[in-house]
C-alpha cells in the first residue's frame, strides 16, 4: 500500500525493493557528470565504503570499493565488473574502526530506519571524507513538480534528513555543494526531467523513483491528469518551456562532504 513502509529488513529501510520491479537498470543509470563531482569529493582515498550501495551506481572503478547492500534484488542488479556487495545495514557495519579512507552514501540515507545511528556508524569505520548525495527539500520550489504534485514534495521532505542534521550526525564538520543536473541526465530522479516533462507521465519512469510508492493513487492521478492537460494545451510550455533547452538545472540535489 502506498505510504506504508516495509516491516522487513530485507531492504535498507522504508522502501521494499524485494516486492517491486522498479526498473533501475533502465531508468536510473549513473550520469557521468554527477559521477565526476562525487568522485572528486572522495579526494585521494584509495579505499571506499559504499553503504546502501544498491546496484552500484557511482562506484569508482579506480579505487578499492567495498559495497554494503541488504536487498537481494538490488545486489542482483550489480554489473559484473563490480565486486559483489556485502549483506549488511548501515546501523551495524561489520568493519573495524577507521577501516576505510572514505565512504559514499548515494541517495540512501533517507531510507534508513535510524539515520543518526547509521551515520555515526559510517563515521566510526571511515577515517576520511564521507560523501552523501541527498536532496535539500527547502529548495523544492525551484522545480515545477512542486506545483503539480505537492504530495510528492510533502512525502520526500518527510523522508530526507535536513542538511544540518546530516552534518551534525557526521561530526559537525561538513561542506555542502549544489549538484547541477544536466538536461540529458541519465539518472532518472524526478529533477532529471526538468526539461523533459512528458517523461514524468510514464509509469515506468515514476516506478524508478521510490517516492511514488508512498503517494496515494488518487494524488498520482491528479498529477498525471493536470500535467498531461497542461502539456496538451501548451500551458506548461508557456510557463516552463525555457527549461527544454536549459543546459542544466540547479534544484534540490546536494552533496554533503564531511571530513574528520
Segments (PLM) and residue ranges:
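A short glycine-rich, Lys/Arg-flanked "PGG" loop and its adjoining helix->strand segment in the class I
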Residues: 116-130
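Class I SAM-dependent methyltransferase SAM/SAH-binding core
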Residues: 47-93
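Local beta-strand N-terminus motif with an aromatic residue
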Residues: 45, 100-101, 127
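Conserved Class I S-adenosyl-L-methionine
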Residues: 176-260
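Conserved class I S-adenosyl-L-methionine
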Residues: 1-46, 57, 72-77, 129-164, 184-191
Amino acid at each position: 500500500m502506498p505510504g506504508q513502509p516495509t516491516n522487513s529488513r530485507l531492504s535498507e529501510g522504508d522502501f521494499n525493493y524485494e516486492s517491486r520491479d522498479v526498473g533501475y537498470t533502465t531508468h536510473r543509470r549513473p550520469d557521468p557528470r554527477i559521477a565526476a563531482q562525487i568522485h572528486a569529493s572522495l579526494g585521494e582515498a584509495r579505499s571506499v565504503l559504499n553503504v546502501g550501495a544498491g546496484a552500484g551506481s557511482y562506484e569508482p572503478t579506480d579505487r578499492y570499493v567495498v559495497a554494503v547492500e541488504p536487498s537481494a534484488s538490488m545486489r542482483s542488479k550489480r554489473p559484473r565488473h563490480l565486486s559483489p556487495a556485502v549483506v549488511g545495514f548501515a546501523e551495524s557495519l561489520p568493519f573495524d574502526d577507521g577501516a576505510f579512507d572514505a565512504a559514499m552514501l548515494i541517495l540512501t540515507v533517507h531510507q534508513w530506519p535510524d539515520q543518526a545511528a547509521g551515520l555515526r556508524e559510517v563515521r566510526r569505520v571511515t577515517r576520511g571524507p564521507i560523501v552523501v548525495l541527498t536532496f535539500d527539500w527547502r529548495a523544492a520550489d525551484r522545480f515545477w513538480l512542486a506545483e503539480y504534485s505537492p504530495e510528492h514534495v510533502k512525502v520526500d521532505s518527510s523522508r530526507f534528513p535536513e542538511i544540518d542534521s546530516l552534518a551534525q550526525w557526521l561530526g559537525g564538520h561538513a561542506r555542502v555543494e549544489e549538484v547541477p543536473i544536466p538536461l540529458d541526465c541519465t539518472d532518472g530522479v524526478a529533477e532529471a526531467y526538468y526539461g523533459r516533462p512528458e517523461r514524468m507521465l510514464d509509469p515506468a519512469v515514476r516506478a524508478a523513483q521510490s517516492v511514488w510508492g508512498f503517494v496515494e493513487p488518487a494524488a498520482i492521478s491528479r498529477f498525471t491528469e493536470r500535467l498531461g492537460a497542461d502539456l496538451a494545451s501548451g500551458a506548461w510550455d508557456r510557463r516552463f518551456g525555457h527549461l527544454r533547452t536549459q543546459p542544466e538545472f540547479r534544484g534540490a540535489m546536494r552533496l554533503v562532504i564531511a571530513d574528520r
